[in-house]
């Protein structure tokens, strides 16, 4: 508990130093950017007129839809690749092939084939989340200590039991790392997708603000994305601690 409180205190101190440095740089004219006070005032304005809330819900809906779908498919596919050599040989080359293609490069194709509604945005987020999570899950399965598997077999455990009692628990830390990486990819992708084709969302708001050189609004969207992403990542970290209590931690 003391270590956790110390960590929280250091987190808050780090944020305070960062905001203080931002304020000093803008107040002294060292950089031509809006200061924290300007950004806060614009955030209040956008909150009161409902724009910020609407943009948050629009982006969150897209991120969660694509992210959940991507992770839900990535985990079983990753286990399949790691557990069965035939499945690995069939699927792994395609996964690596599509990993080399940035999801952002797929956006124009997705718009042409899926239209200009929510489908192309959710699809590219799904793709980014899937590719991040499937590799981590696959790596988790093949990284399981063979001694544990052999010991279970010596004790008479069947493949199904070994998979459920050995492979899955040992792979959970890898899976959660992949999920966290996938979350970051989802946020990066949704912003890019909204910059290209959207009528709402934090990325769309930044694109509109850029046309009028409205830097405070751009900063509001950037800070909001950072806060939302940080909060969601902390939730995943809490899930990680709960699901991997058996694991030694530094």
Curated annotation (Swiss-Prot):
Subcellular locations according to the entry: Cell inner membrane
**Ranges for domain ABC transmembrane type-1:** 56-236
GO CC term, one of those recorded: plasma membrane
Report the main location listed first in the record. Answer: membrane
Highest taxon, organism lineage: Bacteria
Record GO biological process? transmembrane transport
- TM segment ranges: 12-32, 63-83, 94-114, 122-142, 172-192, 211-231
The way it spans or sits in the membrane comes to: Multi-pass membrane protein
Keywords in alphabetical order: Cell inner membrane, Cell membrane, Membrane, Transmembrane, Transmembrane helix, Transport
Q: Name one Pfam family in it.
A: BPD_transp_1
Query: Coiled-coil ranges per the record?
Result: none
Q: What does this protein do?
A: Probably part of an ABC transporter complex. Probably responsible for the translocation of the substrate across the membrane.
Q: Which family does it belong to?
A: Belongs to the binding-protein-dependent transport system permease family.
Q: Summarize the subunit comment.
A: The complex is composed of two ATP-binding proteins (BAB2_1147), two transmembrane proteins (BAB2_1148) and a solute-binding protein (BAB2_1146).
Name of this protein = Probable ABC transporter permease protein BAB2_1148
Source organism of the structure: Brucella abortus (strain 2308)
